[in-house]
């Protein structure tokens, strides 16, 4: 029985640790390409007042660090460009819609920046 219990604890430990993935740190600002830099400027102008980009803490909205390095967005939706775009353009809960504020280039560049986080 002791051996079986040890085996179960070992299996449990392996299962727990396999779910603990570390997220790669954001790309340093100095290493961003031109599109990502413009996306950073869009973020600063329209997103920074509610979302941290390089700190894993909520401000008024969820932190955006590693947002595309996880399988799901903070809303629970799949972490992909389509779902993120839908949220940015149409808003969600407390987040205002940005569809009339951002043009397609701004949106594309913002997504490129979010992918660098």
Language-model segment annotations:
Residues 17-21, 55-58, 82-83:
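Short hydrophobic/aromatic-rich motifs at helix boundaries and adjacent loops
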Residues 32-57, 86, 90:
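Sequence/structural segment immediately N-terminal to covalent heme-attachment motifs in c-type
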Residues 1-20:
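Sec-dependent bacterial lipoprotein signal peptides
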Residues 49, 63-66:
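Soluble periplasmic/extracytoplasmic beta-strand elements of cell-envelope proteins
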Residues 20-42, 80:
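Electrostatic cytochrome c docking/interface patches
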Residues 58-59, 66-117:
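Extracytoplasmic electron-transfer domains, predominantly the class I c-type cytochrome c fold
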């Amino acid at each position: 029985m002791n051996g079986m219990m040890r085996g179960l604890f070992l299996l449990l430990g392996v299962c727990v640790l396999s779910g603990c993935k570390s997220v790669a740190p954001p790309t340093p600002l100095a290493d961003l390409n031109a599109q990502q830099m413009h996306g950073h400027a869009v973020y600063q102008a329209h997103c920074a007042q509610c979302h941290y980009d390089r700190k894993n803490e909520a401000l008024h909205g969820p932190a955006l660090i590693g947002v595309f390095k996880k399988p799901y967005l903070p809303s629970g939706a799949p972490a992909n460009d389509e779902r993120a775009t839908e949220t940015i353009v149409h808003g969600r809960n407390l987040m205002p819609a940005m569809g009339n504020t951002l043009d397609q280039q701004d949106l594309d560049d913002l997504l490129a920046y979010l992918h660098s986080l």
